[in-house]
A protein has these predicted regions:
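Acidic/histidine-rich alpha-helical segments that form the ligand environment
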Residues: 97-130, 143-154
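Short, contiguous alpha-helical
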Residues: 2-95, 133-180
């Protein structure tokens, strides 16, 4: 393993595990909690299948999103980036399965991360400059797939951590910390 691959692998792993630790004991109530009315989330469609709010192009301003939306977004992106950069490239946003539970989303997150970790382990430093396809048709250097997913974990993982803290602060049971 070359120095660049090793650095990407270490950073991707550390960022993922930091995010994953903040997801420990995620409840269904937290997963679906809408801190703002009209938040984008995960929901059952008219056929009873799980789906998620999504628009192209992204609306401006972007809607507020629930933990369910953010977590499934991270998980689905990992699978999609793998699928198009290193897999058969057949999966689309219309065909990928949307997980509808915390456990389902975490399972997809773990599986997607494992796929990307395996993809990176098969590369050497020169392979990182090779162009690979993305799910929206652009070509990127392979390193950018892993760099983007690391940034994605840090960005959305931080948002999820803040939402979990906000949920905990607004859903406390037991004695009032101010003594009231």
């Amino acid at each position: 393993m070359g120095a660049a691959v090793d650095l990407l692998a270490r950073e991707m792993s550390e960022t993922f595990h930091d995010m994953r630790a903040r997801l420990h004991d995620l409840t269904e109530d937290e997963f679906f909690w809408e801190p703002v009315p009209g938040s984008w989330t995960v929901f059952r469609d008219e056929r009873g299948r799980w789906d998620h709010h999504y628009e192209e192009p992204d609306p401006e301003p972007a809607p507020f999103t629930t933990i369910a939306w953010r977590l499934t977004h991270i998980a689905m992106c990992k699978v999609m980036y793998h699928e198009h950069a290193f897999g058969p490239g057949e999966l689309t946003w219309l065909t990928i399965e949307t997980p509808g539970t915390p456990d389902g989303a975490l399972d997809m997150l773990d599986a997607g991360h494992a796929l990307l970790t395996e993809d990176l382990a098969e590369l050497d430093d020169t392979d990182l400059e090779r162009s690979v396809p993305t799910n929206w048709g652009e070509e990127w250097p392979a390193w950018r797939i892993f760099w983007t997913m690391t940034h994605h974990d840090a960005h959305h993982g931080g948002e999820i951590g803040a939402l979990r803290d906000l949920y905990a602060a607004t859903h406390r049971t037991g004695p009032d910390p101010d003594g009231g």
